[in-house]
Amino acid sequence: MTISEVAQGFTSADADDDRWVDPRLIRAAAGAAARGTVLLTNDGVLPLAPQTRVAVFGRVQIDWFAVGYGSGGDVNAPYTTNLLDSLVEAGVAVDAELARTYRDWCAAQAVPTPQWGDWPRFHPEMELDDETVDAAATRAEIAVVVIGRAAGEDRENVLEPGSYYLTETERRLLEQ
């Protein structure tokens, strides 16, 4: 199956009523994502050893940017996943207490469904106190910080915090 075939023939035109996705589409999309992923540096951390204890920080671990923006990107995806659920599904020993903190906060601070052309470039980050970060650090061997951005037609990146630059909350999280 080629990407062209995927784009033209294996999705439903009526996505609100028909959520079926051809399994070949799922495999092709996963393969394209793997080929499009670039790891800049590794320093021996990846792949994670089985049962490595991982603290995952950042709301985008849950509130994932699953699609792009604009005419070709603002779609009703038949399903989505997020990094936290995918790590757990893969058997990574994520810090359950920190994950629960993020799940609860994200549920209380739900990302609104935007109108066309009014998409967010980022999702506001949760402020964490030093005690929460320190406690997670004592339970985990590795920390993963997830920061997300989105852009597309009618919502290009700009040279400001929350787009190309980190917000102050993101910067503080990285410094903790």
Q: What kind of feature is each model-predicted range?
A:
Residues 1-176:
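C-terminal non-catalytic regions of proteins with extracellular/luminal or membrane-system context
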